[in-house]
Regions:
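Hydrophobic alpha-helical membrane-insertion signals
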Residues: 1-29
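Generic alpha-helical segment signature
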Residues: 11, 24, 37, 58, ...
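Short, solvent-exposed coil/turn linker segments
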Residues: 17, 35-39, 95, 185, ...
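Anion-binding and metal-coordination hotspots
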Residues: 66, 73-86, 96-485
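Short amphipathic alpha-helical interface patches used for protein-protein assembly/oligomerization
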Residues: 90-94
Length: 485
């Protein structure tokens, strides 16, 4: 039967409770119940005057507003405020009633600029929520997955300028330099000159070398990232670590043009002391410096197979066998490549004899050198890379590496698809750190809240079942006693 009463209740006056308007299984309700939000007062206490000025907005409400934005992937703060005005669940979560005025969309931005800009407040919020996850024994940091994703910056690709910038130094450069000098001394070679005294251009792997790069005039702190063969954008690189259950353990933010292997140390320092036994990462982290760092710290590095960067039709490096006793390489034609020098990048160079190679039947498959000399390089920390290869072939490691798509890659996919992580509307690295910190806090807290809610439901079911069984047993015993008498 057709019923037409859509407009009858619009002007009714009703009495209701805000708490009754939000379903018991609503996401914001279980999130609000999962954690005590009063910890925010302790974090921001020193940012407010205790007895001067006008009464401020509640700091918990202030933090919850961007929390709603990142939790539901709302594109801007302006749109978030519009959603809060008409959404009862949002108002309930913020502690507002139906007649309270919603803060202006610039309120959070002004408070950020005046109070939170140069602080680590949002990282502390992320850490506090992670501690709650540890408290319930949900996090297992023995196997950690590390990867980086790029978030598009709010910068026009056409508004740029070229600048000369110094390349960031490798985090292990000082240790590598000592190792190079030690190796050259063992081979009776002179130590390398300092860069200031060297007439040659510094090597590409060392810090201090200058290079021309593209810089955005809108967001100079972002980096020019080559997204594909025909696509380049200004972006930020978000390096992230998570455990095998998908709990986010730490993160760092860098310009999009920084390589993952150069920025790894910052993330690794944040993860120190949590009990990592195995660290799983993609081929971008498969460098001797990282392998040495992990193995020396007692951590098992798990890296994938990396295809040799050799021209098609030429012998790959594995065809040249290294003789550890005589410190030389033997080519496929059983000729010796002897040690020549150790370069500034930490690679020992081994060269063949040009006169012998000139008559070699494999010359065209070996080298294109005009003087017929074959060059093979070996890093001073090559034994660490060989250990990584042995680990890769260990039973069970292939299956463990395959879990990346179920952990760190799924995490990135969820953040981009549902939490506005594909791009940022904010300018500057500091604001990007705020966005990443709150987004990852949302992901961890949402997962924690759902698991706690499921545990409560399970406990209530078990409690009801136990009471039912106890009642049945009591009735059974009573009937037996009555029958006996």
């Amino acid at each position: 039967m057709l019923t037409k009463d859509a407009d009858k209740k619009r002007e009714q006056i009703q009495l209701f409770c805000m708490d009754d308007m939000v379903p018991q299984d609503h996401l914001l309700r279980i999130i609000d119940k999962a954690i005590d939000w009063s910890f925010i007062y302790e974090l921001v206490e020193e940012k407010y005057s205790p007895d001067q000025g006008r009464p401020s907005m509640d700091p918990v409400t202030l933090i919850k507003i961007p929390f709603i934005q990142y939790l539901y992937g709302i594109k801007s703060m302006r749109q978030t405020i519009k959603e809060i005005e008409v959404n009862v669940a949002y108002r309930w979560f913020l502690g507002l009633d139906m007649f309270d005025k919603v803060p202006h969309f610039t309120t959070f931005g002004k408070n950020y600029t005046r109070r939170f800009k140069d602080t680590d407040l949002f990282e502390q919020i992320f850490t506090k929520i992670l501690e709650e996850c540890y408290k319930f024994k949900l996090v297992d940091p023995t196997e950690v997955f590390v990867d980086a994703t790029h978030v598009k910056a709010k910068a026009n690709n056409k508004k740029m300028q070229k600048r000369i910038a110094k390349q960031e130094a490798l985090f292990y450069e000082d240790i590598l330099r000592k190792e190079i000098d030690k190796d050259r001394d063992a081979h009776e070679k002179k130590p390398l000159k300092d860069k200031d005294d060297d007439d040659h251009k510094p090597s590409s792997g060392s810090g201090g070398s200058e290079k021309e790069e593209k810089s955005s005039t809108t967001d100079p702190e972002s980096g020019w990232f080559h997204k594909g063969e025909h696509k380049s954008v200004f972006a930020y690189s978000v390096q992230t670590a998570c455990d095998k259950n998908g709990w986010i353990l730490g993160y760092t933010i860098n310009p999009g043009n920084y390589h993952d292997s150069r920025t790894f140390k910052g993330l690794y320092d944040k993860l120190s002391g949590i009990g990592i036994k195995t660290l799983i990462a993609d081929a971008g982290y498969k460098v001797p410096g990282i392998a040495k760092l992990l193995i020396d710290d007692g951590i098992t590095p798990l890296f994938p197979y990396k295809r040799p960067q050799t021209k098609e039709g030429f012998f790959q490096k594995w065809r040249y066998v290294y003789d550890e006793y005589y410190d030389c390489y033997i080519c496929p034609n059983d000729q010796v490549l002897r040690y020549v020098t150790t370069n500034r990048n930490g690679y020992k160079e081994y060269k063949s004899c040009g006169t012998v190679c000139a008559t070699c039947p494999y010359l065209r498959e070996c080298t294109e050198s005009k003087d017929h000399v074959k060059l093979v390089t070996r890093h001073v920390w090559e034994e660490y890379m060989e250990k990584c290869e042995d680990i890769r072939h260990t039973i069970g490691m292939k299956e463990l590496y395959a879990q990346r798509k179920e952990t760190i890659e799924r995490l990135f996919g969820t953040a981009k698809e549902h939490h506005g992580f594909r791009y940022t509307q904010m300018i500057g690295k500091a604001r990007m750190e705020m966005k990443v910190g709150l987004t990852y806090a949302c992901l961890n807290l949402k997962k924690l809240a759902k698991m706690k809610h499921q545990r409560e439901l399970l406990n209530s079911v078990i409690s009801c079942f136990n009471s039912f069984i106890a009642t049945k047993i009591h009735i059974k015993r009573k009937s037996v006693l009555e029958f006996a008498f």
